[in-house]
Amino acid sequence: MITGATGFLGRNLCEYLSSHGYQLRALVRATSNTAMLEDYEVELVQGDVLDPASVRAAVKGCDYVVHAAAYFRLWGPPEPFQNTNVEGTRNVLTAARAEGVQRFIHISTIIVVGPQKAGVVITEQTPRQPYPSDNYAKSKSEGECLVGSFNDQGLPTIILRLGALYGPYGHYAFNRLFFEEFLHNWRVEVHHGRHIIFPCYVVDAAKAIEAALKRGHVGEIYNISDQSISHRTANSIISRLAGRSNWRINVPRWLMLQFVKILELIAYFSKHEPFYPRNLEPYVFHDWIVDCSKAQKELLFTPSNFHEGARRTLDWYRSIGYNV
């Protein structure tokens, strides 16, 4: 059973697992667009992670649960993050324990550790210290604590901490910043693109989930990411693959932060997420150097290089009408 099946990761996961012979069931909200799942023979159970009865019905009879549902924004009050990412997770864990599932894969994020000092390599042992204003990271950290507690009580759980997802069907965060802004000729680069980002091609994430189902060690956490690269390197690869020049307007940190403050002020009155939310700051102005050797050794996880993932992502943008 998969939660979050109509989301960015979930859609790619259903496509991948269906092509590898898995029988899939998904918990979907009444308002979700499920047309994208029709090709993957997914059994749909209508409900919500906030409704324990519907979660129990979705889990019943399933061997595995992949909990990929999450409320992910870079802006907004804490309540929706807490509701979905903490209480929703509690409901799915409770149902999985009650139904005796064989394995529970919890999808988390590397950002639960918070930004690190320059040169620090992030491993699974890096303490959780989410950025104070990042309600998403804080709620995902709490969700991990819940998973650990249920594991201690006998539910076989594995936590996968994903890097910055990009790839087909994505339009937010990494996809927007590195692909869509560029394809719309918005050529901004902060700090000469020197900081390090931790991309994760979404199909690699799907492969890692299957590997965790087969080979993951119960009770463990695994970092799942491609090789960490600089913003400048990512921009250069995307530009070259798209056949466009790699020029960028360099924006100093102080100017970008002032611009972000203005956008936040406008958002306060408009009630709409700003184009550059404040919580992008830890991603853009810090280095995220991630060690995935544990997943490579225990899950046999082999990430794509960014060149290949970016090429496939640009192919997808071309298929939906972008001028690439």
Q: What are the functions of these language-model segments?
A:
Residues 31-38, 42-87, 95, 115:
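NAD(P)H-binding glycine-rich loop region in Rossmannoid oxidoreductase-like domains
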Residues 211-275, 292, 311-314, 321-324:
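Mid/C-terminal beta-alpha module of Rossmann-like enzyme folds, strongest
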Residues 1-20:
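N-terminal Rossmann NAD(P)H-binding glycine-rich loop of SDR-like oxidoreductase domains
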Residues 150-197, 202, 238:
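NAD(P)-dependent short-chain dehydrogenase/reductase
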Residues 132-158:
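Active-site Tyr-X1-5-Lys
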